[in-house]
Regions:
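Glycine-rich, basic loop-to-helix element that forms the pyrophosphate-binding segment
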Residues: 67-85
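Short beta-strand/loop segment that forms part of the nucleotide-sugar
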Residues: 33-43, 65-67
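A conserved acidic beta->alpha catalytic loop
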Residues: 41-51, 69-71
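Donor-binding/catalytic cores of nucleotide-activated saccharide
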Residues: 74-78, 95-232
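Conserved short acidic donor-positioning loop in nucleotide-sugar-dependent glycosyltransferases
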Residues: 25, 42-43, 95
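Short aromatic/hydrophobic "clamp" motif used to bind/position activated sugar donors
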Residues: 90
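Membrane-interface aromatic/basic loop that binds lipid-linked glycans or pyrophosphate carriers
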Residues: 275-337
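Short, well-formed alpha-helical segments that are part of the catalytic scaffolds
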Residues: 14-27
């Protein structure tokens, strides 16, 4: 057996849905014998250990790794997965998502044929069983885009381009640039991809291909992190965004649309998270210079234009002073909470 792609899957309390993810890899048209599947468990307390042990006994190309302490985010498991990957190429999968049947073949053929550092594609958002094609700046680009540098089209650094699991990476490239996921934060995938995209050459975008199924859990105690608006996650998002802004400053880079999109996402968390207003104000002050240069013309392709304008005006008003920040936050909270 000589696998060509290492697929890295961090797991945590995923007993009820992990096998959907695993089976989507096993059933790839690429041939499972061409895949090394690495499952890293972040000290789960459900019955997932038995599932992982059964898988590693059944398949010689499945590696299982168990962390003795919970790390609190997918970062450490993913980093360990990369350290243990033996293949030329690396892909990622979240434990509650799935690959489309030809995903690995499509990505492998593209990265081989075009000798890229990164290939990225589109994904389906699935909410309560309904498949949705997420709209983004990519809708306005050709079906196939090849860049020698992201500087050729920096607007492609949209938040949808920064997802970790709709891509294939050349492992030697990741090792060369020292790309790692930061611990203890969210936006960890954005930070990782920002380093990768600023250094990659070439990069290919498959804008007409939807290869990844992103299952968004919106109900109950088992919500997706992106839907779980609690103070602990707000703090992690703040830390993650701070890392991203610091990285851009250290590299003397400024990507207006990307930074504005990130601020919109963070502002959503400020509005929807039930937390101490003093904490929110402190976070706002820390990012005030970024709010000041927020582009009023930021276009969020996945929402209607009128709502987009409303959001942009709100953020510009917030940036004027502490008073307007509190006022807009209060009004938005009444509307959306």
């Amino acid at each position: 057996m000589n696998p060509k792609i290492s697929v890295i899957v961090p797991t945590y309390n995923a007993e009820s849905y992990l096998m959907n993810a695993v089976n989507s890899v096993i059933n790839q048209s690429f041939g499972f014998e061409n895949i090394e599947l690495i499952l890293i468990d972040d000290n789960s307390n459900d019955g997932i250990m038995d599932i992982l042990n059964d898988l590693s006994r059944k398949y010689e190309n499945i590696k299982t790794i168990f962390l003795e302490e919970n790390s609190g985010s997918p970062s450490k498991p993913r980093n360990i997965g990369m350290d243990n990957a033996s293949c030329e190429y690396v892909m990622f999968l979240d434990n509650d998502d799935e690959y489309v049947e030809d995903f690995c073949k499509k990505m492998y053929d593209t990265i081989e044929n075009h000798q890229c550092d990164i290939v990225t594609c589109r994904n389906y958002d699935v909410v309560k069983g309904e498949y949705q094609k997420y709209h983004s700046v990519l809708d306005k680009r050709p079906d196939f885009v090849k860049l020698n540098s992201i500087e050729e089209d920096p607007d492609l650094l949209s938040t949808t381009s920064m997802l970790i699991w709709n891509k294939i990476y050349k492992k030697s490239f990741l090792l060369e640039i020292g790309a790692k996921f930061p611990s203890g934060t969210l936006y960890e995938d954005v930070y990782f991809n920002l380093i990768a995209f600023m250094n990659a050459s070439p990069i290919v975008y498959l804008n007409d291909y939807f290869g990844y199924i992103y299952n968004i859990r919106v109900d109950g105690d088992d919500k997706s992190t992106s839907q779980d608006f609690k103070e602990e996650n707000l703090i992690k998002f703040y830390n993650g965004l701070n890392n991203i802004f610091n990285l851009l400053e250290s590299e003397n880079k400024h990507y207006s649309n990307f930074e504005s999109e990130m601020l919109v996402g963070f502002t959503k968390w400020l509005v929807l998270t039930k937390s101490d207003d003093k904490l929110k104000l402190r976070f706002f002050k820390d990012f005030k210079k970024h709010y000041k240069r927020f582009s009023l013309f930021t276009r969020l392709e996945h929402i209607p234009l009128v709502f987009n304008i409303f959001i942009n005006l709100g953020i510009k008003l917030m940036s004027l002073s502490d008073f307007t920040f509190k006022l807009v936050l209060k009004i938005a909270g009444l509307i959306f909470n």
